[in-house]
Amino acid sequence: MPRPNFMAVTEFTFEGFSIFEWHHRLILFVIFLVLYVLTLASNAIILIVIRLNHQLHTPMYFFLSVLSISETYYTVAINPQMLSGLLSPQQTISIPGCAAQLFFYLTFGVNKCFLLTAMGYDHYVAICNPLQYSVIMGKKACIQLVSGSWNIGLSTAIIQVSSVFSLPFCDANLISHFFCDIRPIMKLACADTTIKEFITLLISLCVLVLPMVLIFISYVLIVTTILKIASAEGRRKAFATCASHLTVVIVHYGRTSFIYLKPKSQNSLQDRLISVTYTVITPLLNPVVYSLRNKEVKDALLRALGRKPLS
């Protein structure tokens, strides 16, 4: 008996924001393009400032520079496709191209989750064990933490992409999204996806809940230690050290958890609009938060511009 032809679909079409009128899409294009350029520029500035200022050659800023690199590639993997789709609705992408986009999206997205965890551990050691900080957070330890984050990101992406694209796609090829994400792609499969969805949920729990728990434990210990500091000024400085990281953590995990840990939604437009926050807005938020809330970064930036650092 001949096998059914499961290779009927050779490319996917993005629904994107085609539901909006042309003039609305044009406004969105301009807004998202500005945010995209600002994201690339601000992350590049963070990297340059850290590279040129030897006072910032510490573990905390090493992690921040790696985070900026990850955010840049993460943005490049998604935003150009979205911007192009705003100008030309019903844009197509080949199945290998879709698999590649999903691979890079997952690699850098998961990498970010564990980088934030490593940064939380760095803050914990700095505040709770300051006398041993230089020993614990040596160059080798920092490289191992970053390498571990990248390896987890790559492994997760390989597993997920292999799982999703082993499914047969027969007739439906319209992705109800503006980029290749797991759930919208699995909806198009002409086979039972129960096991694949369970794998996705299990991985989501591992890469979202586990880092959140580790960061939460770190901050419980950090806050406990800070409250034991005698001087109000000392407590203020300690809290200020963690404020930027904590802001980024809350925003990142709050939005991604809402998308990937909630039950399947029938409102694909709502999911797309929420996805905009972590593919367009959050990558810009990180360098802005670290620049505005971190005195060392602000002073280094002012020195690079030839201006006097803040007193």
UniProtKB/Swiss-Prot annotation:
Location of the protein in the cell: Cell membrane
GO terms under cellular component: membrane; plasma membrane
Gene3D superfamilies: Rhodopsin 7-helix transmembrane proteins (1.20.1070.10)
Transmembrane segments: 30-50, 58-78, 99-119, 150-170, 203-223, 238-254, 273-292
Cytoplasmic topological segments: 51-57, 120-149, 224-237, 293-311
Gene Ontology biological process terms, A to Z: detection of chemical stimulus involved in sensory perception of smell
A GO molecular-function descriptor: odorant binding
Residues exposed to the Extracellular side: 1-29, 79-98, 171-202, 255-272
Membrane association type: Multi-pass membrane protein
Cysteine disulfide partners in this protein: 98-180
Keyword check for NADP: no
Keywords: Cell membrane, Disulfide bond, G-protein coupled receptor, Membrane, Olfaction, Receptor, Sensory transduction, Transducer, Transmembrane, Transmembrane helix
InterPro entries: GPCR_Rhodpsn, GPCR_Rhodpsn_7TM, Olfact_rcpt
Described purpose of this protein according to its UniProt entry: Odorant receptor.
Family statement drawn from the similarity comment of this UniProt entry: Belongs to the G-protein coupled receptor 1 family.
Protein name stated in the entry: Olfactory receptor 10J4
Organism: Homo sapiens (Human)
